[in-house]
Amino acid sequence: MAVQQNKKSKSKKGMRRSHDRVAVPTIVYCACGEPTVPHRACPSCGTYKGRQVVAQPNE
């Protein structure tokens, strides 16, 4: 196992970790008004790009 030869400073450690954050998901609103994730079919109405792609059970 590798062992470091010199101590990494707080600055160098912070610079290395600068990209480790969790990305905030982008939220868009469907034509039905429900929030959804981009490039996915709407879970509430089943539409994608204005077309019905997921069959919804009759209510």
From Swiss-Prot:
Disulfide bonds: none
One Gene Ontology molecular-function label: structural constituent of ribosome
Ranges annotated as biased composition (Basic residues): 7-19
GO cellular component: large ribosomal subunit
InterPro entries, alphabetized: Ribosomal_bL32, Ribosomal_bL32_bact, Ribosomal_zn-bd
Residue ranges, annotated region (Disordered): 1-20
Example of a GO biological process term: translation
The entry's keywords: Ribonucleoprotein, Ribosomal protein
Family: Belongs to the bacterial ribosomal protein bL32 family.
Name of the protein described by the UniProt record: Large ribosomal subunit protein bL32
Organism this protein belongs to: Nitratidesulfovibrio vulgaris (strain DSM 19637 / Miyazaki F) (Desulfovibrio vulgaris)
Name of the gene: rpmF
